[in-house]
Amino acid sequence: MATQEAPLFKIHDATVRRKEKVILHVDDFELAEGENIALLGPNGAGKSTFIQLLTREVLPLHRDVPPVIFRGQERPSLADIKACFGVVSNTMHDQVRVHLPARDIVCGGLFGTLGIPRHVHATEADFKKAEEQLERLGIGELANRDIMTMSTGQVRRVLVARELVHDPQALIFDEPCTGLDPEGMYQLRGVMRQLASEGRSVILVTHYPEDIIPAIDRVLLIKDAAIYADGKKEELLTGDCMTELFGVPLAVESNHGWYSLREKFDEGE
């Protein structure tokens, strides 16, 4: 008799506090292995805290039964969680203020550092892995270029390559298109599509339905430090839901699996 595979994550009755304030409460949530999902909501709703709960950057209030279970383990090691995930965020982008070639930035992903640590001797095999990931994302020609001379979109793809170099099963994109021009957005959304097609989980945090690639079927709406709704994107990416979520009149349009959001003004405004 086949046993059912444990979900990647299972959360039950998890509360995160900052000082005396609840900044996130999750009643029930499960994410299957290989599942793609988008977290959508306004600033301060709890989206980033939700991701930090998954990656153990924040811990929930203690319960006799741990509220967050990873692959069936009640007390997984931090090393196991880090090995599973790659994270691309604006915070990481802001830390890239060093004159290093892209190859060294990507190679640092093998050691969990930004660049190669001084006490580590990177091998030719390490550099080859880094170059392969840059090639895979269509930026192999940037391998020896100083990252400080690159466009925002190029840097963002270098950071994706840095996460891919340790072969994670899931990629978290936290507001990945912030600060990008249309070309950069196009390229990064293409990267997410590529990773999803390979069977990796894509977990996207965003304010904008435009960032949600067609391969993402499930949407989690976060509002007021809690899950407001969880379901199929075609059911939740509607004008009524978005208006309720963001608190202003909004309309949603869809085209071949892509969604776009626009303000809805009264006639004459």
Specify the residue positions occupied by each region the protein language model found:
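Conserved catalytic motifs of ABC-family nucleotide-binding domains
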Residues: 167
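Conserved ABC ATPase "signature" region
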Residues: 122-142
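ABC ATPase nucleotide-binding domains
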Residues: 243-269
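H-loop/switch region of ABC-family ATPase nucleotide-binding domains
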Residues: 206-207
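Conserved ABC ATPase signature
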Residues: 121, 146-150
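H-loop (His-switch) and adjacent beta-strand-loop-beta switch element
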Residues: 219-232
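Catalytic Walker B motif of ABC-type/P-loop ATPase nucleotide-binding domains
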Residues: 171-175
